[in-house]
Structure formats: structure tokens, C-alpha cells
Amino acid sequence: MLKEFLSYFQDFKKGILANILISFGLINDRSALKALPFKYPLGITPNYPFHDITRLTTLSPGEPILIYRRSFKLNWYFVQKSFYSGWINTKDLIEVSKKTFFDYNKSARTLILMESKVCTEELPTIGKFHFQMGDKLVLANEVETNRFYFKMNTLFPEGCYPVKIPL
């Protein structure tokens, strides 16, 4: 099953040493995948200070990634997504076991977004999540949904999809 999953990753075997231990992770908040691990945006000119030229793409909550290395200060991971590899801040992902990783990604209950941008309602303890077109969301089962709403002390709103996001 691992080989099948890794076959989806572009150029997986090129340049990756056999002795590198691969960890598994899931994105827990919308975040930037960067070419270089800089905390602040690196702009082209002073007129565009917030146009970060080191940003490769944006990752959405719940996306699967492979973790290869940690930075020296341990606040960045070098990761691989299907078509990109780069650096991501450690606060934007959660390391999970191999079993959890595959269980989450092989879930039969999924929803593919067809709108350009979608966001969840803001909850005081969690916040608000932003998604983009094409994101695959794993839906929570009935037990997980009831547990969440019991913990939050609120009722389940009709017509909503309970999304499972790694926290």
C-alpha cells in the first residue's frame, strides 16, 4: 500500500537517499509551502513587500504530506506533496502514524469542493478554516460528529457536512 501511495508523488526516488526516514503528516491549517525556510515574506521590490517569491503553493487543511527533514532550529519541515516539495512551518502540520495517515486518506466518506473558495464557520476554540477549489475533504462519521458537538455543547446544524480536520 505504501508503494502505491508513493507512486503518486512526482520524482519520488530521484535524489532521495535510502537511509532517510520518512514521517507522515497532515496539514492542520491553510499554509504556505516555501522554497526556502524564511519566516517573513521575501519580496522582489520594496513596492511589493508581501509578494513572497519563496512561496511555491498553498496547502489546505487535511492534505497528506511526507516529511523528510527538520530544520536545525526544528521549526520547519522539508516535505513532499504530490507535485511540490519544500519547507513548511511546524505549527501548520501534525505528524501522524502510518496507520492514521492511510486511514484518513483512504476514507470512503469524502467531499470534493467545486467552489473557488469555501470557509467554515468560526468556532471559538478552533477558529475558521479556508479551503479552495479541488480540495478533498474527509467527512466525519456519525460517532465523531456526535462526540464533537457534545464536547462543544451545541446542536448539529441541519444541511451541513461535518468535516474531519486533523488538530
Positions of predicted regions on the chain:
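Boundary regions of SH3-family modules and the immediately adjacent low-complexity/disordered segments
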Residues: 1-34, 38-50, 57-60, 68, ...
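Mid-sequence acidic-hydrophobic segments that form the walls
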Residues: 65
